[in-house]
């Protein structure tokens, strides 16, 4: 099981230079490494980027600056819950691990 933590998420090629430069430098290595999921922040808003959305071989969860992500990993899957300050679950994602 491989979980990557990166502050700045990758972008589709439009937008801020930093996102695109990190994508150019790191995405090929992470794709080759067999990453199961990548967790990010930086944008201060939630998003979930499916496999292939930014040439990625793994899903990317981007969390906001006001919520937390609870991650539970087993041999077969990674469960992620995005939870707000009141404890309400806003989003759930499960990634199967091979």
What residues fall within each predicted segment?
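Binuclear metal-dependent phosphoesterase catalytic core
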Residues: 46-98
């Amino acid at each position: 099981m491989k979980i990557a933590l990166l502050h700045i998420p990758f972008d589709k090629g439009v937008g801020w230079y930093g996102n695109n430069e990190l994508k150019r430098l790191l995405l090929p290595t992470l794709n080759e490494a067999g990453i199961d999921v990548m967790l990010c922040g930086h944008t201060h808003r939630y998003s979930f980027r499916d496999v292939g959305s930014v040439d990625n071989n793994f899903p990317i969860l981007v969390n906001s600056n006001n919520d937390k992500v609870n991650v539970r990993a087993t041999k077969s899957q990674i469960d992620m819950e995005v939870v707000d300050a009141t404890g309400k679950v806003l989003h759930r994602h499960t990634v199967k691990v091979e």
